[in-house]
Amino acid sequence: MKHTPKNVIYHNLVGLRVEVLAHPDPSMKGLKGRIIDESKSFLTIEKDNGELVKVQKLGTFVLVLPSGRKVEVRGELLRGRPEERLKKFLKA
């Protein structure tokens, strides 16, 4: 299944570029990088300088799809493990 704006929340996000637009922790706002790991509640982002940062799946994110298209996503839609989100998609 290809990443599209409608189904991106049901995919594993590892490998996608991301930017934090808004977050309850103000130090996370503006953070950019590549998602290298994803858990139920956190994204691990590798910044361009190689630094790893764990970010809670709260606030608002911009994900860059493999096609280059940018999608704005609310963090609460990303909560849960990728396989759990996919199960919800398949049931719908």
Swiss-Prot record:
SUPFAM superfamilies: Rof/RNase P subunit-like (SSF101744)
Subcellular location as annotated: Cytoplasm
InterPro entries per UniProt: RNase_P/MRP_Rpp29_sf, RNP1, Rof/RNase_P-like, Rpp29/RNP1
Domain of life: Archaea
Presence of the UniProt keyword tRNA processing in the record: yes
Subunit relationships: Consists of a catalytic RNA component and at least 4-5 protein subunits.
Name recorded for this polypeptide: Ribonuclease P protein component 1
Organism expressing this protein natively: Ignicoccus hospitalis (strain KIN4/I / DSM 18386 / JCM 14125)
